[in-house]
Amino acid sequence: MSNEKMHIESNTVQETLVIPLWGRKYCSEIYPEIYQDTTAKKIMEKLDYDFSTLEAKKNNTMFRFGYLEAAARYTDLGTEIRAYVKSHPAAAIVNLGCGLDCTAENNAGDTCKIYNIDRPDVIEVRNKLIPPTANTTNIGSDLNDTKWFEEIDDSNGVIFFAAGVFYYFLSDEVKKLFTAMAKRFPGGRLVFDTANKSAVKMMLKTWVKTAGITDISKYFYVNDLSEDLQVWLPDTKVSAKGYMLGYHDLKIPSVSGFFRLLSKIGDGFMKMRIVRIDFNKN
């Protein structure tokens, strides 16, 4: 590979990938007890981009809490992946809406098959910065175009995961996708983060305004597992844990009591969850 760095322009697809990449590096630095992503740092060394705006914000209290949320999410999903791989050592691990995230690579076993799926323009950038290894397949596809199903080898089990992805999907799109996945991948598992309607409205506030969207209620949220998921996925087992405190108590030196209080509010009032859906075998 060339040592020439990839130049990243503002207001481009590449920039939307670089910002969360910087976030994963930053999470590793300020919350090392719960999250480590050495891959993010290595990828950043290949980039020509002005990170000064992000660096200037990093000591802001709410900015730091936002990255605690990110650290918790990636750690939770990594925990779910490792648990599945323990009982399915040659499983397929599928990162839905991968961007430049390496959660699959960081948590997979040596005998696992890894699939990273995102839009073709995103995969083009990923292939340049993170060339796929022998056990990795990068797929350029809209998640709603289920032709990508045929590229997944689920013969030894499969776990799908998505980090911060489905908030941007319409509820009808999620229903159609999940139903198709349950039918095509019996015995598989899907894990992802979610929140209630109020929280999703807050998270998408800027994006909704920019996109000219007037009815946020059409977008995917989960107020109640039974009413918003299980009712239209009868042949599955749906469960959930708190996003912030369901996998760890955050009683670590880098997390203040105030942040633990905010975490409790997030899991409680905003119903921030990591949802697991097990697709029943036929």
Question: Where are the predicted features?
Answer:
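Short, glycine-/aromatic-enriched active-site segment of Class I SAM-dependent methyltransferases
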Residues: K201-I216
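A short, conserved alpha-helix within the catalytic core of class I
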Residues: Y168-M181
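Rossmann-like AdoMet
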Residues: M1-V94, C98-I139, D154-S155
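Short amphipathic alpha-helix with an adjacent loop that forms part of the alpha/beta core around
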Residues: T146-N156
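Short alpha-helix
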Residues: I216-Y243
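A conserved beta-strand element that flanks and buttresses the S-adenosyl-L-methionine
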Residues: F160-F161
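Conserved catalytic loop of SAM-dependent methyltransferase domains
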Residues: D235-L261
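Conserved beta-strand signature within the Rossmann-like core of class I S-adenosyl-L-methionine
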Residues: M181-K197
